[in-house]
């Protein structure tokens, strides 16, 4: 279904130059992904322990099917950001004072719908609302390539197909990062991402070459068999072979740690996150990591050597330790919101890698890994959607501070500084509460879902003897709460630093009367004529559209009310782990 949709979009893009049908293409892709979810859901009972495809290049199991559905769902939620107009209406449109006074003011009858359309168009122009993200017809097509690469990567069973899948996913992300052609900052971020992403691919290719040189096969099943034989044989030659296989896997894993921005290979992610548009950052920060971690889970499960003196898993433990330290300490110095989220992601990757490293030693540790990955993906998605929504809601406001006026690429990334959220609670309390709940979940505050995820990881690590790393994880969680609370302080404990824009319209008003169109500082919309003034309260400027509101509400409620439905979530995780261990 994904391949058919890609071909259809390629043909459609080739025969049309209209940029305004991008929304239609996005909605078509959403429908296709919904169909994929239904198809994969119905095939879960058929696949059972696994099905090999294309001569063993792909291996489809229940665990890969479940995470395919998860990726499709996340992609749908991200695609709806560009599939619907984020602004539903203006409060003025149906205000009775406005409707009653308008005929007296202009002196003749004009249909109210025409007046509303004109005013809406003028308000978009006055307040600088930018719809560029709704006019990129290549956007859904490139997203499908990324999704296709992610699905193949999770299901691959061969070293060659691993490399091709990760490159298909990565090149789509490189193009997405530079898709806003008029943004110099976005182009710079995309170039950094491309150069360092290509460098990380060299490690993957080198590791795959060493694995082939030491095993004589590119099939993962063959590698698993050789690894299991080296476990049961105790002679020197077998140990020597196992050592080189583990060394090759270590180099192989370095490339993937680069891709997910785990420390010490994290240095590219804060710059790239901050430079590319926020909508693209959402996809880069979530989808690319899910597929890689599921592949690493399979590799860890089948290649962890209990009898060897050296295991490539030690590299994951070192990366976990460095991610916890660097993501927390460096995050304390950040004042740009997306750079802060980048370091927050690095810190959370420390927990994920810790759970991954011990995932083969007990069912509980694998369950902790899967649960943490799922909940963090949803929480991270919610934060980015809320930031995008806040950016849309602030288009009608200006800041007097000079540092805000010097921000680059403000149209594609409206919220860049933490201080831009100052006093936002007084502008939109519900959206502020949703952001606060999600941030508290990041910090691991009970009874939110993030607390239970961290508790499961720490419990699994302690049960398997990783006391030192568990202590580091606890300390970094406490310290990391500082920069999360700093965001809360800016939102709730300061007065708003925003003012509504005030604009006069001259010589372009379409009706033959003298006019003056304003958005004034008293939160009121007014139109002045020769003898009459029509005014109406504007409340908070924009009303966010229903798809945005519903998505934020559902994810926030799940995060908040997890304590009341934890059995369902944990039962689902247990079933997935049992499926994995039974294959």
From Swiss-Prot:
One of its GO terms (molecular function) is NADH dehydrogenase (ubiquinone) activity. Its EC number is 7.1.1.2. It holds the Pfam family Proton_antipo_M. It is a multi-pass membrane protein. The chain crosses the membrane at residues 28-48, 67-87, 136-156, 191-211, 247-267, 276-296, 312-332, 340-360, 380-399, 433-453, 465-485, 544-564. Keywords: Electron transport, Membrane, Mitochondrion, Mitochondrion inner membrane, NAD, Respiratory chain, Translocase, Transmembrane, Transmembrane helix, Transport, Ubiquinone. GO terms for biological process: ATP synthesis coupled electron transport. Core subunit of the mitochondrial membrane respiratory chain NADH dehydrogenase (Complex I) that is believed to belong to the minimal assembly required for catalysis. Complex I functions in the transfer of electrons from NADH to the respiratory chain. The immediate electron acceptor for the enzyme is believed to be ubiquinone. This is NADH-ubiquinone oxidoreductase chain 2. It comes from Neurospora crassa (strain ATCC 24698 / 74-OR23-1A / CBS 708.71 / DSM 1257 / FGSC 987). The gene is ndh-2.
């Amino acid at each position: 279904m994904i391949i058919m949709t890609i071909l259809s979009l390629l043909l459609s893009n080739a025969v049309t130059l209209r940029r305004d049908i991008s929304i239609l293409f996005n909605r078509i892709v959403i429908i296709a992904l919904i169909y994929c979810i239904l198809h994969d859901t119905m095939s879960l009972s058929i696949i059972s322990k696994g099905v090999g495809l294309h001569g063993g290049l792909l291996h489809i199991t229940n665990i890969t099917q479940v995470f395919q559905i998860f990726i499709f769902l996340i992609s749908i939620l991200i695609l709806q950001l560009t599939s619907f107009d984020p602004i539903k209406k203006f409060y003025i449109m149906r205000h009775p004072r406005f409707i009653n006074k308008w005929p007296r003011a202009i002196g003749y009858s004009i249909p109210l719908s025409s007046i509303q359309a004109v005013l809406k168009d003028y308000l978009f122009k006055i307040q600088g609302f930018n719809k560029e993200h709704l006019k990129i017809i290549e956007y859904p097509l490139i997203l499908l390539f990324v999704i296709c690469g992610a699905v193949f990567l999770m299901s691959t069973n061969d070293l060659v197909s691993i490399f091709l899948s990760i490159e298909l996913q990565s090149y789509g992300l490189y193009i997405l990062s530079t898709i806003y052609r008029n943004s110099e900052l976005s182009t710079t971020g995309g170039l950094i991402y491309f150069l360092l992403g290509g460098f990380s691919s060299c490690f993957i290719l080198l590791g795959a070459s060493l694995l082939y040189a030491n095993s004589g096969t590119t099939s993962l099943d063959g590698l698993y068999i050789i690894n299991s034989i080296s476990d049961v044989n105790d002679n020197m030659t077998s140990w020597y072979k196992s050592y080189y296989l583990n060394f090759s896997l270590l180099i192989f894993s370095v490339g993937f740690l680069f891709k997910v921005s785990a420390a010490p290979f994290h240095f590219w992610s804060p710059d790239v996150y901050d430079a590319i548009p926020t909508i693209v950052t959402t996809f880069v920060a979530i989808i690319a990591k899910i597929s890689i971690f599921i592949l690493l889970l399979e590799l860890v499960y089948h290649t962890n050597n209990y009898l060897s003196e050296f295991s490539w898993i030690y590299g994951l433990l070192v990366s976990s330790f460095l991610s916890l330290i660097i993501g927390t300490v460096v995050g304390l110095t950040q004042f740009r919101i997306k750079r802060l989220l980048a370091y927050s992601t690095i810190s959370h990757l420390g927990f994920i890698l810790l759970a991954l490293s011990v995932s083969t030693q007990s069912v509980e540790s694998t369950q902790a890994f899967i649960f943490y990955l799922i909940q963090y993906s949803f929480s991270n998605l919610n934060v980015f959607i809320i930031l995008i929504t806040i950016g849309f809601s602030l288009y009608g406001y200006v800041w007097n501070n000079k540092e805000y006026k010097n921000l680059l690429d403000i149209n594609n990334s409206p919220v860049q500084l933490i201080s831009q959220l100052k006093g936002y609670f007084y502008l939109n309390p519900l959206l502020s509460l949703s952001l606060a709940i999600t941030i508290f979940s990041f910090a691991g505050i009970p009874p939110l879902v993030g607390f239970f995820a961290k508790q499961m990881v720490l419990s699994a690590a302690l049960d398997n003897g990783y006391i030192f790393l568990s202590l580091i994880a606890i300390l970094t969680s406490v310290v990391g709460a500082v920069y999360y609370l700093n965001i809360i302080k800016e939102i709730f404990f300061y007065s708003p630093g925003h003012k509504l824009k005030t604009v006069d319209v001259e010589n372009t008003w379409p009706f033959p009367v003298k006019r003056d169109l304003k958005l004034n500082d008293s939160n009121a919309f007014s139109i002045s004529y020769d003898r009459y003034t029509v005014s109406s309260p504007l409340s908070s400027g924009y009303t966010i559209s229903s798809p945005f509101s519903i998505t934020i509400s559902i994810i926030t409620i799940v995060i908040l009310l997890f304590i009341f439905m934890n059995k369902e979530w944990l039962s689902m995780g247990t079933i997935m782990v049992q499926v994995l261990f039974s294959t």
